[in-house]
């Protein structure tokens, strides 16, 4: 489902790489049994390759896709790659923590939530977003389709997920560069074709 930031990350990256794909909007919760028939591990995103091989994890799927496209969404120059990997790592950390907070509030009954754990995860999320804000201020990322790259996709998708699912946890006024970059990226055709939500890639 495109309500998963990891699924969106892959869908957008595949488009940027010029690779055609079919999207089956399955949920690890709402369509668990159907998902399990495709991948018994029930992990999103899952990619079924042309030969039937099943791949998991957004980073690994994008890595495989890059081999098919024979080009990378990461820069080759070591210093530029170092920066892109740092930004990508921070964005993935923020993504992981935001998903944990979202699940805690939507799946676990209130009386069973562990306050200290939620506080710790929220603190980690804020640190990651704060670091991302500083990175974008010091070294802005190109938000065009030709320049956004994997780091930019990951940042934009993560911030959009935060805004849509746990908006009260990360104040946008304290992260103006993040918010602005995400808005610019969401205006790209590749992002618009894979909107956050329960829909299908490419549907109007």
Predicted feature residues:
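GST-like domain detector, emphasizing the conserved glutathione-binding G-site
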Residues: 1-115
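Class I S-adenosyl-L-methionine
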Residues: 11, 15, 133, 163, ...
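Aromatic-glycine hotspot motif
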Residues: 47, 59, 125-133, 190
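Non-transmembrane alpha-helical segments in soluble domains
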Residues: 62, 66, 85-88, 129, ...
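GST-like fold's C-terminal all-alpha helical module
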Residues: 91-180
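C-terminal end-helix/capping segment
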Residues: 173-194
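Carbohydrate-binding/catalytic loop surfaces
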Residues: 199-204
């Amino acid at each position: 489902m495109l309500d998963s930031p990891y699924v969106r990350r892959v869908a957008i990256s595949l488009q940027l790489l010029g690779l055609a794909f079919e999207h089956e909007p399955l949920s690890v919760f709402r369509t668990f049994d159907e998902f399990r028939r495709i991948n018994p591990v029930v992990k999103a995103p899952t990619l079924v390759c042309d030969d039937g091989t099943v791949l998991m994890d957004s980073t690994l799927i994008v890595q495989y896709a890059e081999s098919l496209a024979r080009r990378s969404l990461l820069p080759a120059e070591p210093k530029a790659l170092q920066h892109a990997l740092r930004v990508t790592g921070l964005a993935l950390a923020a993504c992981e923590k935001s998903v944990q907070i979202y699940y805690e509030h939507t799946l676990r009954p209130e009386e069973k939530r562990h306050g200290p754990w939620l506080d710790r995860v929220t603190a980690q999320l804020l640190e990651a977003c704060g670091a991302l804000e500083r990175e974008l201020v010091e070294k802005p990322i190109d938000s065009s389709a030709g320049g956004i790259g994997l780091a930019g996709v990951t940042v934009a998708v993560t911030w959009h997920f935060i805004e849509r699912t746990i908006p009260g946890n990360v104040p946008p006024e304290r992260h103006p560069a993040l918010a602005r970059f995400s808005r610019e990226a969401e205006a790209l055709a590749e992002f618009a074709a894979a909107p956050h939500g329960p829909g299908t890639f490419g549907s109007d």
